[in-house]
A protein has these predicted regions:
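Nucleic-acid endo/exonuclease domains
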Residues: 2-170
């Protein structure tokens, strides 16, 4: 803001608000830090899921359903007409056999029980899909990071229609 005097070149002192001192937030305990970190983990629309969906879209494989509730276990990506379900598993949560992620060091019994329940649920869904005659693919987060193109090729082959005698090693 400039002065309206004859010179008009000097500035008027603008009123500035004084900054109030803010106390820093209280330090979090280790348990609270872990809780805050885990709260940020999503179960839907994760980065690996978005990578696969984007690759499928660019490959022209459209018409999929995302987290389709009519299929057992709400697969991450599902082609109902082709009876093809794609599960994209995070290595940590589903205990990847390829990269074998480390167990958390705190509250070990809780984590062991949680991982066992996740693996039991995955086995239950595997059986339900086999009984229903669906093709089921499990893509691991580490596999997608290493070879997204190979995973996409597998999905394309199954989308075209592979004989039911062909089993997926997953």
């Amino acid at each position: 803001m400039f002065c309206s005097c004859i010179y008009g070149t000097h500035r008027l002192a603008a009123k500035r608000k004084k900054k109030k001192y803010k106390a820093p937030p209280p330090l979090l305990t280790a348990a609270e830090k872990v809780s805050r970190y885990m709260r940020g983990n999503k179960s839907k629309n994760t980065t690996p899921e978005l990578m696969v969906r984007k690759a499928l879209w660019h490959a022209g494989l459209r018409g999929y359903r995302v987290h389709w509730p009519k299929a057992p276990g709400k697969p991450d990506i599902c082609y109902p007409g082709r009876q093809l379900a794609i599960f994209i598993h995070g290595c940590f949560w589903h205990r990847c056999p390829h990269c074998q992620p480390a167990l958390p060091k705190t509250n070990v019994p809780f984590w062991e029980e949680k991982f066992e329940k996740n693996q039991a649920r995955d086995a239950r869904y595997r059986l339900q899909y086999r009984e229903a005659g669906w093709q089921r693919i499990v893509l691991w987060e580490c596999q997608l990071r290493q070879n997204l193109a190979g995973s996409l090729t597998l999905i394309q082959e199954l989308h075209r229609g592979v004989p039911s005698s062909w089993e997926i090693a997953a």
